[in-house]
């Protein structure tokens, strides 16, 4: 508030060798290499995406090594691979460190460098889908006379999974699963499509036939594409709602799977909407009290854990664009109207028990006075920055009580209808600097899911009186418009 890594099951080391063989014939054969000989492994792709990384990622990779990984899919399926992070030392024609993707029916593709580097050839957002049921990734680094970690290149992180044969349309899809049900001689192949519950639900389901490349048909021969939509507001490990005490507690993994940790001008929070949007406060992007803002400030987003160090290990989710509500005025220090923003991520995020979106509100009853909700965040606590996700159970406060509290203190802050207040004047609470942008959630008894009704916006001091939140309901149409590409 202002002023106010599941790793894929793989091994890089060959099961036949625990170190560098000392035999002279091997040294003669591989004398050109400085390190261990080629290491190989075989991975079995599954419906859900799994991670494959360079050795030691995200720490800088060592020099003078070669690793080949064969990724195989079950009969009737292909392998899809896409890079989420790629950082190799650039070189002309990728003659130095490189990653090579190869499979039957296609020429090998070699990559190096980083996105935007003038030298090198990074893969960018390209996805690789094997023509058969296997794909090979080869990672090579050139020998070096320098310290093997004396460079700043961390390697790569890729996601791989199975897709149906003749797959031709991009998926974000952690979401879609396919189960082959064709018998010998069947043509075309029939695939029972389904969504990965409980993280996704189907908008169109059933047995679809892969008739032509990129076309699915149902039993009535009508074209239909399975749409898997993220399930919001239903944690696999929900918070225990029977607690009676107010105040701060440490969150368990999976309690608040929508929680994001942001680092822009400082630490902040946010909440996942769908599988590629972060809901946050505008003032975390354009602070009210900042005199010398740097242009092109980096926006870092982390998800998937309750410990900051573990979130950092999982890696930053690059942001494609930032959308701030037009009503937000950075130069009006006492007016936080329109304190809401959306961050669109470059890639959709595979959902799972520790990464799930929160729902949006749809009615005023979710704001009634006395309704208890939860606010979570990585903000300061007792003057110290926390490294663990904390949460507090707090009631929605009467609007008139908050107005009176502000007037008593002769505060100039605007308390508009697009805001609401939370807390109890007689109780201490823990919302403070670093919590900005995190959300206040309540349980919707009718829809049976958690709803983000508020965004931590502003307050007077820490742990005292009331805190003031952006009323998300007032901005639902704007949020949906941005997410649907209308705004």
Curated annotation (Swiss-Prot):
Domain CUB: from-to ranges: 39-163
Active-site residues, Swiss-Prot/TrEMBL: 283 (charge relay system), 339 (charge relay system), 436 (charge relay system)
Tissue occurrence: Highly expressed in placenta, liver, kidney, pancreas, moderately in lung, spleen, prostate, ovary, colon, and PBL, and weakly in heart, skeletal muscle, thymus, testis, and small intestine.
Ranges of residues in domain Sushi: 165-230
Positions annotated with a glycan in the UniProt record: 147, 166, 242, 296, 363
Disulphide bonds in the chain: 94-112, 195-228, 402-421, 432-462
UniProt keyword annotations, A-Z: Complement pathway, Disulfide bond, Glycoprotein, Hydrolase, Immunity, Innate immunity, Protease, Secreted, Serine protease, Signal, Sushi
Annotated GO MF terms: serine-type endopeptidase activity
GO terms classed as biological process: complement activation, classical pathway; innate immune response; zymogen activation
Functional description taken from the UniProt entry: Mediates the proteolytic cleavage of HP/haptoglobin in the endoplasmic reticulum.
Protein name in the entry: Complement C1r subcomponent-like protein
Organism annotation: Homo sapiens (Human)
Name of the gene: C1RL
């Amino acid at each position: 508030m202002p002023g106010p890594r599941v790793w894929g099951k793989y091994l890089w080391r060959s099961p036949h060798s625990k170190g560098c063989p000392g035999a002279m014939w091997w040294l003669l054969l591989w004398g050109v290499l400085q390190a261990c000989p080629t290491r190989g492994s075989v991975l079995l792709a599954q419906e859900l995406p799994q991670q494959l990384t360079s050795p030691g990622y995200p720490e800088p990779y060592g020099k003078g090594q070669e690793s080949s990984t064969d990724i195989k899919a079950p009969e009737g399926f292909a392998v899809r691979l896409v890079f989420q992070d790629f950082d190799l030392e650039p070189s002309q024609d990728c003659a130095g460190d490189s990653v090579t993707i190869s499979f039957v029916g296609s020429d090998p593709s070699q990559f190096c460098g980083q996105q935007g580097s003038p030298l090198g050839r990074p893969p960018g957002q390209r996805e690789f889908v094997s023509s058969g049921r296997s794909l090979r990734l080869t990672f090579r680094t050139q020998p070096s006379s320098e310290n093997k970690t004396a460079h700043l290149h961390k390697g790569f992180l890729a996601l791989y999974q199975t897709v149906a044969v003749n797959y031709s349309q991009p998926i974000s899809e952690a979401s879609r699963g396919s189960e082959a049900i064709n018998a010998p001689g069947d043509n075309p192949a029939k695939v029972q499509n389904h969504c990965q519950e409980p993280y996704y639900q189907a908008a169109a389901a059933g047995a679809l036939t892969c008739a032509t490349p990129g076309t699915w048909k149902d039993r009535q021969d009508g074209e239909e594409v399975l749409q898997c939509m993220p399930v919001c507001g239903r944690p696999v490990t929900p918070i225990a709602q029977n607690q009676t005490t107010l105040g701060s507690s440490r969150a368990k993994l999976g309690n608040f799977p929508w929680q994001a940790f942001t680092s822009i001008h400082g630490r902040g929070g946010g909440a996942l909407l769908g599988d590629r949007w972060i809901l946050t406060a505008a003032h975390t992007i354009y602070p009210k009290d900042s005199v010398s803002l740097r242009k092109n400030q980096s926006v870092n987003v982390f998800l998937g854990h309750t410990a900051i160090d573990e979130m950092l290990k999982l890696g930053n989710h690059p942001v494609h664009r930032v959308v701030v509500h037009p009503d937000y005025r950075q130069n009006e220090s006492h007016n936080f109207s329109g304190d809401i923003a959306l961050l669109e991520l470059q890639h959709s995020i595979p959902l799972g028990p520790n990464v799930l979106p929160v729902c949006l509100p749809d009615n005023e009853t979710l704001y009634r006075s006395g309704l208890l909700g939860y606010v979570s965040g990585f903000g300061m606590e007792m003057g110290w920055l926390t490294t663990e996700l904390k949460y507090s159970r707090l009631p929605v406060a009467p609007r008139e009580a908050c107005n009176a509290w502000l007037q008593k203190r002769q505060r100039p802050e605007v308390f508009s209808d697009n805001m609401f207040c939370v807390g109890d004047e007689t109780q201490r609470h823990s919302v403070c600097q670093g919590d900005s942008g995190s959300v206040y959630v309540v349980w919707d008894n009718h829809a049976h899911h958690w709803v983000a009704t508020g965004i931590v916006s502003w307050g007077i001091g820490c742990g005292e009186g009331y805190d003031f939140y952006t009323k998300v309901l007032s901005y639902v149409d704007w949020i949906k418009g941005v997410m649907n590409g209308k705004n």
